[in-house]
């Protein structure tokens, strides 16, 4: 007799810290064993069901959608989806259960089954070891609701009493008139994952494996067993019943029906006609002189394709969100592939004029691609929440939710969880964590383990590392996407379960952005960008002090002084070109116009670097190499001197040279992005080569293009993205060049953001001769502000007054009370300040320690004394200042002030710490950053500086880039991999770092190639100088 079986009760690793295998592993194993179907029944979640659906499609083995859940004060049950109605019912049930509980938990109540949900089949999993009456009552309760849609699940796992258990379960089923079926309670695809499953169980229960006891399964039988093994335990009729149930479950995720909201369309209009009307209004605003024939044709082409694909409502929704932001004076800008669209530009979603660029609309939408477009919009990072709450208000929480992100285990974190439950002591776990790389999930080598004092051959360490390797990449929990929104015409809970986010007033769906693409749900990304906050604040400050109202659209273009500043790499604080790698490239590329900035933004990226495109481009730009490309491809290559730098160029080459359709070219782009992870690029090699040879191109050229495509890997940068970012790059550079005080002030008020700390931004401003005034309770507001100066140079006639936000641990509400009280009359002493601003002891002491009372009372020692006196008299206050005996206190030393500044403000307006150490350093023949400007190439020397940044790009072959700061400027240090590994503790842990190395000076770019590192942090005597690491 041919045995058949379908597993109806199986958990994937999306039953967090329970399931020990991925959906792909489960489906591949079930297919190998000859199963007829596989149900994925993760506990009260559908978070992994799209991945299971993909695994089902790739293997051809049918997927049954389901979920296991414990009913509060009731039975344990597995619900299986029979049809569309059942799927919607399951989504709603999970949503209700998750929404009524805390993050990561659920509560299913009996009332959730009143009335019984249609379209769901139920497997009852009775607890024979518990209360017999309660078990029987639970079965009766389920039978009353599910009737002929209920089965009793029989799980047998080589227990000592399996025969008796089978008899008891069958008797229970018969007594209630409920059919029985075999089910495996599967937690892993293979027996070999038992150790990992035990480990995850201990992690989940916050115990050790040794102490977990009955929490662990008795054996490894909860895996996908071969049919022969199953037949040893189950009668054939119990196995066959599983297949009959599976055949009833016909639902497929591909059948989901999704509609975008329609309420934005006025009466008498359709979504298509209304989108056209809004687009035409935008055309008149954007192009007051009228459209060129080419642009008109592009607009018509886009509108026709949008209507054909039924994306009109999506565009209307994004337009509505952008219009709300603008109505609230929230700066925003669309980016990414949407910048390829003339319609998006007309609607005000993007700011990139398609007439001034050569962008490819098919990168955004194509007829052949059966996927929705993806529009990303950046908003001011500290006002994005206003936009998010507007969306919730507009559509209701039932129809709008944020996308999830499946947070996964990484190297060190996975090891910590594993080692803890295997009983390693905390000090060993911490030491072992040091041996893990910060930059990859790879396990440490035996050599590295020995370096940190571990014997790689000890059994416990082998076990920890083996289990860690299995756990890396597993989902750990669902978290919230930075801003991906799904909005629906119908309640979202009919499409996907919705649960509470960790943040208040937010809900998330249980799928991530890749899941949404696969099932065809439209998403709009509401993203946060700190630079937009800084630009808007700069515009406001300039308007306040100059009377000039700038916008992104009205800033003067192609400004010579701005490009000269950029070419000097004087770009601290600006957008995108402020990193160490970008600043090293700027003097070599020397941008002169906007498109040069587009290339600059894109060229210092993994794709062009790995594709060996950077140096050929620079050589051609500098006249060191001939610019060559086939004449037929001039429209593709002329703007990048024959070197492909962008995804769109690869697509255009495929279309023009190899006869790809636009949709096929987009498939090439996707294969290019995924080939390193999933393969799939090789079929395009022959297709490209054959097409290009047929059209008269040289074989060498075809091969070179393909190798460059491979080099792009998953890092090919879209030109539309680079162009959108370049707009903000230019705006930030122009403002830094022409309004440096306002720009720096706005950056600090917008912090945290960007690459540099407020201290580094202020030091840069001082090097540019901007006057910085201290925090002073007599003048400072919460934010930093500008104060006029009598200076003939427009770029230097505004001083920055530091705000009370700079004082560590000081609260904004205290600052606002100071502003209100001060507006009535000036403060006269500490008592007056404390009384009228209603400051408690903590707030008053923070002001005194920071020096903010210097102008009102005197130096820090004096201020702290008077504040302490005010606190002693506080019970006697009667609204009148008190008189105190004057006490003479010593002035703080320069060093004491410096330490206090960094401790309380994170910066200093006094001498730079290195200035105080310069004599000591000079005695040891240390060079300063200023000295390096005049020294010849290949000189060996030592420097010392505060570490303000460490970077280790993924494309740098393990090289770490360190930026040091002294009183004159910055020193860029290159630390090769072997030195970084040998001196990792010094490299990562030093605040004041000495570097001995070789100076490399070429084309205006200077680096120090490190040969030895020394930690000089003790010389700082308590300064807390924080670097911005590994950005």
Swiss-Prot record:
Localization, UniProt: Cytoplasm
Enzyme class (EC, first level): transferase
GO molecular function: 3'-5' exonuclease activity; DNA-directed DNA polymerase activity; nucleic acid binding
UniProt main location, coarse: cytoplasm
UniProt xrefs under CDD domains: DnaE_OBF, PHP_PolIIIA_DnaE2
GO cellular component: cytoplasm
GO biological process, one term: DNA replication
Keywords in alphabetical order: Cytoplasm, DNA damage, DNA repair, DNA replication, DNA-directed DNA polymerase, Nucleotidyltransferase, Transferase
Gene3D superfamilies assigned: 1.10.150.870, Metal-dependent hydrolases
Swiss-Prot/TrEMBL catalytic activity: DNA(n) + a 2'-deoxyribonucleoside 5'-triphosphate = DNA(n+1) + diphosphate
Assigned EC number: 2.7.7.7
Family classification: Belongs to the DNA polymerase type-C family. DnaE2 subfamily.
Described purpose of this protein according to its UniProt entry: DNA polymerase involved in damage-induced mutagenesis and translesion synthesis (TLS). It is not the major replicative DNA polymerase.
Protein known as: Error-prone DNA polymerase
Organism name: Pseudomonas syringae pv. syringae (strain B728a)
Source taxonomy: Bacteria, Pseudomonadati, Pseudomonadota, Gammaproteobacteria, Pseudomonadales
